[in-house]
Amino acid sequence: SFLSNVRFSKNGKYISYTKTKANLEKNDYEHYVYVYDTQSKENKEYTSLGKEKNIVWLDDTRLLFQTSRDSNIKEKKKEGEEWTEYYSIDVRGGEAKAFLQLPYSVTDIQACSSGFVFTANYSNADISLHGLTGEERAKAIEKKKEEADYEVLDEIPFWSNGLGFTNKQRNRLYRYETASQKIEALTPEFMNVEYFKVSENRVLFIAEEYHDKLEQTNALYEYDLLENRCSCLIEDGNYNFSFADYMGRDIVCAASDMKSFGINENHKLYFVKNGTLELFYENDTWLLSTVGSDCKFGGGKTFHTTDNALYFLSTLEDFSVINCLHRDGRLELLTARDGSVDFFDIYKDTLVYGAMKDYGLQELYLKENTEEIEITKHNRTVFEEYSVSKPEKIFMESYGESIEIYVIKPVGFEEGKEYPAILDIHGGPKTVYGNVFYHEMQVWANLGYFVFFTNPHGSDGRGNRFMDIRGKYGSIDYEDLMKATDIVLESYPIDRKRVGVTGGSYGGFMTNWIIGHTDRFACAVSQRSISNWISKFGTTDIGYYFNADQNQSTPWNKVEKLWSHSPLKYANQVKTPTLFIHSEEDYRCWLAEGLQMFTALKYHGVEARLCMFRGENHELSRSGKPKHRVRRLEEITNWFERYLKKQERE
């Protein structure tokens, strides 16, 4: 079970959350609303259709959730209309009731004093069917069908991973008045809202308005719902904001000017004072959890404010925690320095959070003062039914840094016996591996493999300077990975001729890079990879700014540098049999990246295979259709079995 979106009720008596489960037969995911009673300690499922999520508390006992139940709306959606349905339920008893129907594809919703504020997808190019009837509606539907054959692009990015083509689409801010049932747009047609937070009659939001090219800076706004007035607090052009909220009478925010370490620079915390930013805390951590796992689905709150404190997630070394930053500047760590805290909520002095602790799967934990209890047991039976090999931790030195290396032994490990091994490389590169459960790694450990992984330079958790490998891809990070491999092979009974390598996204880039620079690995699996920084620049949703920033070059000012950091340049040196895993709708690292490397290997006579997944994107391994996730893991595992256990079969 995957847990997400934990929320206290208004009076703190109840805690709601979403439980998501994969349904292999339906090849989809089911979402259920659960509520925990903090007084009776009872944990109860409140919905049963498997379509309920995105919970908002209306008051002390009633909650609102998104679902899909109305047959008329389903028919309208088939014709091309956008609708989002909300139902309410009283946790003291009774059936769920239809509460709100919005003629938009809602992306987030929050309650305000007079109704709701929400964001929704808005298209400046699409044909709207809302309000049309009779012949006029029929003609519009026919026109939409005709236009479905075409995509007109006149801005960048023109598509987005997980969303498809997004040309002229924006995430727009709206207000819904309960009394009048009136919906009003609060932002212009071409403004894209990235974040908003409601506090009674005021709304803070982060947005940027653009027409041809989306830049990486944005602006901070405040909307007064009583006076219907929008004020720009900090203008666009200087900062990238990621969060803002009210802290008593003050406004606190997280932002970076990106001048020292580029687009991945850690955001500092500021107060907004008279149109300027006043430093609150000199932060040098990423303000969320970047601890990876293939057993997370959905998210939740990562910031919370009171009159005198700011609570936030951050990634430290190889774990993530909840911090409390007091108004006087004192920083207090609220959770253990291990595992991954993924989301949380706070009511007065009580903290509830979702985490992967003690190498387990996600559960919810309740902490009041110093006392902490686990309030869910959704995933405990997994460890009673299956064998799990927990990682050991060893260390290496690299340019003055002590870097952890995790090693998972094969299940049923026997002294005196040599085993095959797999080096697994994380994506990002600004993420981390930690002492956190990975399903794929345990599958391999159960099949008799050592699995090892590390956090090379470029990873998160150690500050900006460690993270910053701009212009250095394939150098210092490659050195770290090869050194980690050397140390693991020296420390464990591994057959050096039966070691494989795999990774996804940046990890796929490194896999491609590795096979072009060494033949030490018996086989490789390159997933959702990068092979050519030049082609990625012009074909992906982030390429035009991410490539320029991370490589310190563009195809027009330093094309030789882009090419020198491209694994494709070295494909003529590859001898390693390589499997490529790529999704057809991966617009983060487009299919062309895998195809180019695959073609190059085939051209040069190297054994290669590519498995493409239709209808999937960059998130295949984490949230792809269940059957596709199974097939992906089968493809990878079969490749390792073929090349790393060949000697055993012989």
Residue ranges and their predicted role:
Residues 37-41, 90-94, 177-181, 224-228, ...:
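Short loop/turn segments that connect beta-strands within beta-propeller blades
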Residues 4-5, 146-147, 151-154, 159-160, ...:
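Non-catalytic accessory segments flanking enzyme active sites
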Residues 456-650:
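Active-site-proximal cap/loop segments of hydrolase catalytic domains
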